[in-house]
């Protein structure tokens, strides 16, 4: 059974950041998924420069992987939401599909439908695109700061700084405060000219 990694446009991570063993993957499939380019279910007006940049980055990532000896397939956008799923089913049949958490509800829903329709095994991995893991967030919501279920930026910020020992002196914040937001709220003086 083949190990296939599906890489969506927001998952162009360096090899060392991939949450699975890159050498255990038989084929990488980089897909221009319709949710990131143009989709019938979620109509969004994308900035043309963003689309050009996204495609260029994906093509670069294709070269990045192939230059390192990995077997890579690039699927161009067709407008079909099921593009990658039909491709995998047609060309590989049943396989282990390695997918980094897409952090997108509609895409997760499509992946689940594909898994059910084709009896496909999906192996999910936590996204390395975030500092905090899902477990970290669950721990925070169960902690004293999060136990009251009223989530405020200040309490989260203090918890985060303590957890990662950022600007901390033992158990106390350097400078005596966790946040200096009130100093960041001054308006730009009129005498300063800003050219756009």
Curated annotation (Swiss-Prot):
It comes from the Viruses. InterPro entries: PhrB-like, Rossmann-like_a/b/a_fold, UV-DNA_repair_photolyase. Pfam families: DPRP. Signal peptide: none annotated. PANTHER family: SLR1343 PROTEIN (PTHR38657:SF1). This is Uncharacterized protein R852.
């Amino acid at each position: 059974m083949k190990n296939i990694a599906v890489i969506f446009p927001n998952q162009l991570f360096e090899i060392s950041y991939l949450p699975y063993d890159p050498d255990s993957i038989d084929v990488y499939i980089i897909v221009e998924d319709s949710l990131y380019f143009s989709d019938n279910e979620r109509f969004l007006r994308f900035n043309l420069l963003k689309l050009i940049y996204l495609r260029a980055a994906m093509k670069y990532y294709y070269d990045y992987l192939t230059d390192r000896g990995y077997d890579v397939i690039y699927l161009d956008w067709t407008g079909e939401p099921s593009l990658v799923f039909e491709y995998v089913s047609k060309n590989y049949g049943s396989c282990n599909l390695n997918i980094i958490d897409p952090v997108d509800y509609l895409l997760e829903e499509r992946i689940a439908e594909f898994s059910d329709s084709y009896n496909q095994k999906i192996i999910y991995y936590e996204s390395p695109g975030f500092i905090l893991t899902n477990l970290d967030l669950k721990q925070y919501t169960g902690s004293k700061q999060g136990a009251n279920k009223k989530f405020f930026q200040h309490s989260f910020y203090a918890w985060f700084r303590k957890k990662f020992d950022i600007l901390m002196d033992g158990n106390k914040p350097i400078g005596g405060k966790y946040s200096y937001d009130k100093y960041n709220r001054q308006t730009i003086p009129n005498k300063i000219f800003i050219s756009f």
